[in-house]
Amino acid sequence: MKLTDVDFAVEASGMVRAFNQAGVLDVSDVHVAQRLCALAGESDERVALAVAVAVRALRAGSVCVDLLSIARVAGHDDLPWPDPADWLAAVRASPLLADPPVLHLYDDRLLYLDRYWREEEQVCADLLALLTSRRPAGVPDLRRLFPTGFDEQRRAAEIALSQGVTVLTGGPGTGKTTTVARLLALVAEQAELAGEPRPRIALAAPTGKAAARLAEAVRREMAKLDATDRARLGDLHAVTLHRLLGAKPGARFRQDRQNRLPHNVIVVDETSMVSLTLMARLAEAVRPGARLILVGDADQLASVEAGAVLADLVDGFSVRDDALVAQLRTSHRFGKVIGTLAEAIRAGDGDAVLGLLRSGEERIEFVDDEDPAPRLRAVLVPHALRLREAALLGASDVALATLDEHRLLCAHRDGPTGVLHWNRRVQAWLAEETGQPPWTPWYAGRPLLVTANDYGLRVYNGDTGVVLAGPTGLRAVISGASGPLDVATGRLGDVETMHAMTIHKSQGSQVDEVTVLMPQEDSRLLTRELLYTAVTRAKRKVRVVGSEASVRAAIARRAVRASGLRMRLQSTGCG
């Protein structure tokens, strides 16, 4: 336990102190709870504990806390958890729920801080309003672009053409982008048949890498269309959601409820990465009558920030009579064995997963050595040397392509299976091979990961790149949403070395070969969604490094985030 935690626990009292000392609550949880209770004149320690666990839930990705199940979920049976009925009664009676409320209860069990209550309520209301704001229109001939053999995609397009908000979900290789490109051609045809102007279309994704992949995939599919369809669509580009909404440092987005987006059709890819807060900003900026198409894989990891919006939308819309979810299930892209592995993970079949990992298939490798370092070195060092060779030649296209040949993915940043440890280890191995000091901060061939948005440079959190040698010194080339960006290394502030990266950061990208470094089986981050996300980053080969116990632990554990959005969407109202 950190010294600061112990010091703060001395100042805390009652239940909050006990939970802080047990490691369930950290300093920030306790501080917020004490501050809010003091301002409201709330003296009941059960309410203080409720506030603290609500703040804790946000750190874990939930937008609220379920007071009826938190004791079981938190896994500390030895702590003095309040009786659930008494706990809820104390919260209901708290001045923190008075007007103006600091806390809210939904379904008499889910406790929210005010901001997230309002955002969830707003997302529900805005999406349902968009759902019903489009007037019925004629549907073009779907079989023209979705002939026999494209039945799932044709049904998805039919759904999207008939409603204002569409959730299009499916795993990798199921044809989501193919469906989107051809759907957009039909949307343009639909407008033409109705005598309307050509629709203004926006393509967006949460990260620059995801936006670049979306743009590339849509362009590739558009090239297969006839000249009339291509002319209807015009030249489509993809941007990050932050750029679409007009992000301004230290201020709200430029596009909001008072200044709506001008587009008739907005497509968002990798929606599983979108937090509740970002979805609230997007939904309020979409003008009435526009068509919103949310694309993603609901079985992947949810956003780094609070919320599991895509999964909630799938579950919430699925039971409504006025909203259909477009689901694609048949994979066309993967080598059969990787797709089968991903499906076994998604289904939670641990025996099938381990059977595939040990099958000896060329596209799948399982490394369960007690010390995997020698086998990892044989993979990581040759890749790093190929990257260095391209970088020394200043060959930006070759370097970026080489970068995407392989990724080492970790669940954690810290610890023996974490990103920081393996970045240092690969740099040390490189130093042995090249003689370059491992502490050199900038060097040709250094793989880069952007960790914060820089709107001036147009580089965004999650973008990747490489440091290149040039006639005037080192430069960085970043794989941005609109193509490669050449940037002076001195202008890049928030970047880190990317010989390894977290699985969360890998979302929105795919590479030829992936090595997944599993943490110990007791890791809190180890979930089915984590392993599924990691495996589905691979196009050609996946290598899983870890024990059988860690694989089984991942398969058995689901990433569950508390939220009321699903229930709100299923009910008659959002409040």
From Swiss-Prot:
Pfam families: AAA_19, RecD_N, UvrD_C_2
GO BP annotations, alphabetical order: DNA recombination; double-strand break repair via homologous recombination
EC number: 5.6.2.3
Keyword Nuclease: yes
Residues that coordinate or bind ATP: 170-177
Disruption phenotype: Not essential for growth.
GO molecular function annotations of the record: 5'-3' DNA helicase activity; ATP binding; ATP hydrolysis activity; DNA binding; exodeoxyribonuclease V activity; single-stranded DNA helicase activity
Record InterPro entries: Coronavir_polyprotein_1ab (IPR050534), P-loop_NTPase (IPR027417), RecD (IPR006344), RecD_N (IPR049550), RecD_N_sf (IPR041851), UvrD-like_helicase_C (IPR027785)
Catalytic activity: Couples ATP hydrolysis with the unwinding of duplex DNA at the replication fork by translocating in the 5'-3' direction. This creates two antiparallel DNA single strands (ssDNA). The leading ssDNA polymer is the template for DNA polymerase III holoenzyme which synthesizes a continuous strand; ATP + H2O = ADP + phosphate + H(+)
Coiled-coil segments on the chain, per record: none
Annotated Gene Ontology cellular component terms: cytosol; exodeoxyribonuclease V complex; peptidoglycan-based cell wall; plasma membrane
Sorted UniProt keywords: ATP-binding, DNA damage, DNA repair, DNA-binding, Exonuclease, Helicase, Hydrolase, Isomerase, Nuclease, Nucleotide-binding
Anything else known: In the RecBCD complex, RecB has a slow 3'-5' helicase, an exonuclease activity and loads RecA onto ssDNA, RecD has a fast 5'-3' helicase activity, while RecC stimulates the ATPase and processivity of the RecB helicase and contributes to recognition of the Chi site.
Family indicated by similarity: Belongs to the RecD family.
Complexes and interactors: Heterotrimer of RecB, RecC and RecD. All subunits contribute to DNA-binding.
Function of the protein: A helicase/nuclease that prepares dsDNA breaks (DSB) for recombinational DNA repair. Binds to DSBs and unwinds DNA via a highly rapid and processive ATP-dependent bidirectional helicase activity. Holoenzyme degrades any linearized DNA that is unable to undergo homologous recombination. In the holoenzyme this subunit has ssDNA-dependent ATPase and 5'-3' helicase activity. When added to pre-assembled RecBC greatly stimulates nuclease activity and augments holoenzyme processivity.
HAMAP family, per the entry: RecD
Entry protein name: RecBCD enzyme subunit RecD
Higher taxonomy: Bacteria, Bacillati, Actinomycetota, Actinomycetes, Mycobacteriales
Encoding gene per record: recD
